[in-house]
Amino acid sequence: MLAWIRAGALAALLLGGVLAAAGGAEARTVRWAASGDPNTLDPHSQNVGTVTMVLQQIYEGLVTRNPDLSPAPGLATSWSQEEPTRWRFNLRQGVRFHGGEPFTAEDVVFSFARAQQPTSNFGIFVDTIDHAVAVDERTVDIVTKVPDPILPNKIISVYMMSKPWSEAHNATRPQNTRAREETHTVRNTNGTGPYRLAVREPDVRTVMARNDAWWGWQGQQGEQPPGNVTEIVYRPIASDATRIAALLSGEVDFVLDPPLQDLNRLRSASGVKVLEGPEVRTLYIVFDVGRDELLYSDVKGRNPFKDLRVRQALYQAIDIQAIHRTTMRGQSVVTGSLIPEQVNGYVREEDVRLPYDQARARALLAEAGYPNGFQVTLDCPNNRYINDEQICQAITAMWARVGVRTSLRSQPIAPFFAQIQRDDTSVYLLGWGVPTLDALYSFQSLLASRDGGPGDGIWNFGRYSNQRMDELIARMKTETGPARQAAIREALKLYREDVPHVPLHHQMIPWAMRTNLTIPHAANNQPYFRWAVMN
């Protein structure tokens, strides 16, 4: 494994030297590794972290983020709410796509329309948008169906694409991943961001070279000074041991997901440092509460998860403190809430777990008609979240103690996400980040009924549906101030009462890197190499 890392790194360094010579800057290559690889490079297809962590180096939205995740001007230099349902964005001038095409107002109109198409997984960010209109070459208005007080925050995740380039490559709609569609945008990009795609070999390496024409290199992107990295070489390395060996030997500079059991060794290792902080991400166990009969269970003719007592039983059978202490080695924040504390709308009084109580769990199962338990299959990724497979292994053992015999089906993120997006699951582990830093994003994506508006229930593969919850989510979309917070608070209470999920914990995210690399640690677990400095 290390041999091919060496060979790839040498090739990348040679490529970086050529690029740096052409751009007049000293070559600074960062070799980056994590366990998983993006399953697409289409900027409007898959709203998952393994995709966005790469694409944010290449593409940009009208609004971007500072290192502290606060909104900042991106391809729009300013914006204002002209009317309750009309936002105006003033576009940055002189910007070109990596292919040479000028960035125009028509590209903005096209990009928002593309993100609204049925094959897009980004409907949650554009659900209130009726249409975008080019006022003139430098101005775009976004007209919403209803007042949307957090629109600028939501569209940070909507990246701008070149309309002519998309049309030329028959890519005017997002890739349909459910149909396993292969399009030009799966392996090719054309953004305006700080880095452009140089090499894409799925599951092997992705090389991104500095875009010397990027506007932000002139220090125009907030208070954080720009970095000096001229090239990024990303390699998925599934093996924890190999990934850490590569870092310790100096063959990798940055590891996004070091295993928790290696942190103490990394902290004391020469030439290596560890950055740590809380992530805006919560892990849950999600039940299929929609089907009349589970796909993967020995219970026939009914769905045990439709019974609140069964969901409560499996919740109370989980010793979350044991998972925190042993599986996560203290690197988690135990929660009873849908959202973490950093998210707008969080209510501490609603962050209360059902107590761990195996006797109560057995009693609830018996009351529900399952005195001897039942069998079910738990779906779990094995390379997406910190210790994801180990968490699922611990839970299956805990459920077995109350009579629920659980088969664990763990797999890499690409087939795992494809499976749950086909509704081919009975119960599964999900981690959910909140890029908007607002509670609506989680409620609308995970708990809104799937027959609602655009973006509603887009990740609600448990098919939870509650009319009152839908009403509260509708209020969150349009109301402001105390009325909006009251809706969020009631929804958090209803979430606790209905138990559509078992909330587990918020992740703590360690990053491991060589000491000659400096990069701001981000709570969304997304490395921004535009601010990285390599010495």
Mark where each language-model region is.
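Structural transition elements
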Residues: Y195-R196, Q316, V333-E367, R384-E389
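Long beta-strand-rich cores associated with HINT superfamily self-processing modules
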Residues: W511-N535
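Extracytoplasmic/peripheral linker and loop segments enriched in polar/acidic and small residues
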Residues: R88, R309-Q312, Q316, H324, ...
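Ligand-site clamp/hinge motif
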Residues: T183, A213-R265, L308, T396, ...
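Gly/Pro-rich hinge or "lid" segments in bacterial periplasmic/extracellular proteins
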Residues: S70, V158-V233, Q358-A359, A363
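N-terminal lobe/hinge region of extracytoplasmic solute-binding protein
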Residues: A33-E83, A113, N190
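Surface-exposed binding/hinge segments that line
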Residues: S80, I124-P174, P194-E201
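Acidic-aromatic pocket-rim loops
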Residues: Q46, P278-Y296, G301, P415-K477, ...
